[in-house]
Each structure stands twice: as structure tokens, then as C-alpha cells.
């Protein structure tokens, strides 16, 4: 979720940028990752290691081609990572869910930024604040009132979507572990009930956190100004 929120804010700012290149890159990113189902994206991440048969290494690019060209055995790398293990494990899971969530969070953050009156940013710039400082200190704090509620919903949905990690050979995932226990003990239904209760517990904690965050960032909005009793009309006094 951290990857999704930080990436979403970044792409939201890029989408609102007057630079057509940044805006186009952000639009393409949100268009692609919002359109591809998460299960398909995770399954693709699990097989992404096929594209890197020689692994991911730090050294001379395409070193194996150079070695074949000169007929030399060995590599010109300082370190090598197994791409299959990398993309089919925790890294692939975080990358797949994070990129997908960033696309949705980009639209949520963009809507929150647009909800802030433009006069706020203009006033900050008139005081000499830079664009980045205006965004961090003026616009985003006010936009949080709009951003927090859908972000809480996305966090809850993200927790539930971790069950889709069964598309990856990630044996540490909750649903996979409980399904394996049910298959070994031939008690599938109790395992599914246990998984449901665990997900319900985690999402309930997130709902409580969402409630307090909404109350914190919603302070001062939608409240009527208190009446000053000093200027209240005396009984029996009518208007002119």
C-alpha cells in the first residue's frame, strides 16, 4: 500500500503537470494498470523471469553475448540475482499489487488535489512559495479530506486482494497456507472460515483507523459558525 500511495501521488502530480510528456506518461500508466486485472498482472509477474534467462546482474550489459562472440567462458558481472526467484516471490507480489494500486490512487489523489480551491495555491505563490512547497504544505493537507475516505477503501480492498497472490508461488500467503492445511487434513470448509475470520479481523482494524483519519482531516469542514449571543435580538423586538 505504501508503494501504491506514494506512486499514486507522484503520478497524480504528473497528470496535472502542464508538461505534455509527464502528463502523457501518467495517463498511459493509469490507463494500462487500471485496465489489466490484478490476477492477470500477478500471473504475468510470476513468469516475468523468463525474459531474463541469464538473471539480473550488476556488470557489463549483455555480457553473455560478448563472451559467446569472443569464445570465452564466464561472465562479466559483479553480482547476479535469479530473476525467476525474484519475480515469483515477495518482490513480484509487492511490485504487481503496488503498480496496480498506484494507478487507482493516482485518480483518487488527482480528484483530491482538484477539490482544493485554486486561490489557495495562487495565494501561496504570491507569498513566494515554490510549486513543490505549495503542493506539500498547502494543497495536499487540504486535499487529504477528500483523499482519505477512498484511500481507506483501497487499503481494505488491497488486503483482500492479497488472496490473489495464489497466482504466484508465494507460499507465505495466508490463503495459500490455509488452503494447504485444508487439503492435508481434508477439512476445507473450516480452513476457509478461518481465512475469512482473519481477513475480517485485519479489515476491521483498518476500518477503525480510517474512521479516526477521516475525523482528523475533516476538522473544520461542514461545521456551522457559532452564533454570537451578544448580538442576539431581545424578545419582542421586531425588524424595521
Segment roles from a protein language model:
Residues 1-240:
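Transmembrane alpha-helices and adjacent helix-loop boundaries
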Amino acid at each position: 500500500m505504501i508503494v501504491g500511495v506514494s506512486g499514486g501521488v507522484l503520478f497524480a502530480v504528473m497528470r496535472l503537470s502542464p508538461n505534455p510528456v509527464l502528463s502523457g506518461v501518467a495517463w498511459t500508466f493509469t490507463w494500462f494498470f487500471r485496465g489489466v486485472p490484478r490476477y492477470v498482472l500477478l500471473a504475468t509477474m510470476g513468469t516475468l523471469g523468463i525474459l531474463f534467462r541469464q538473471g539480473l546482474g550488476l556488470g557489463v550489459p549483455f555480457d553473455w553475448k560478448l563472451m559467446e562472440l569472443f569464445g570465452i567462458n564466464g561472465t562479466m558481472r559483479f553480482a547476479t540475482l535469479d530473476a525467476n526467484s525474484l519475480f515469483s516471490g515477495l518482490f513480484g507480489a509487492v511490485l504487481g499489487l503496488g503498480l496496480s494500486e498506484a494507478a487507482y490512487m493516482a485518480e483518487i489523489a488527482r480528484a483530491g488535489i482538484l477539490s482544493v480551491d485554486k486561490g489557495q495555491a495562487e495565494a501561496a505563490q504570491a507569498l513566494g512559495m515554490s510549486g513543490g512547497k505549495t503542493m506539500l504544505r498547502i494543497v495536499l493537507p487540504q486535499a487529504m479530506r477528500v483523499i482519505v475516505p477512498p484511500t481507506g477503501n483501497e487499503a481494505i480492498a488491497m488486503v483482500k486482494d492479497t488472496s490473489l497472490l495464489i497466482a504466484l508461488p508465494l507460499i507465505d500467503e495466508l490463503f495459500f497456507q490455509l488452503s494447504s492445511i485444508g487439503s492435508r487434513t481434508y477439512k476445507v470448509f473450516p480452513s476457509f472460515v478461518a481465512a475469512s475470520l482473519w481477513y475480517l479481523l485485519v479489515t476491521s482494524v483498518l476500518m477503525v483507523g480510517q474512521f479516526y483519519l477521516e475525523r482528523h482531516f475533516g476538522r473544520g469542514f461542514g461545521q456551522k459558525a457559532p452564533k454570537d449571543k451578544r448580538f442576539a435580538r431581545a424578545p419582542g423586538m421586531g425588524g424595521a
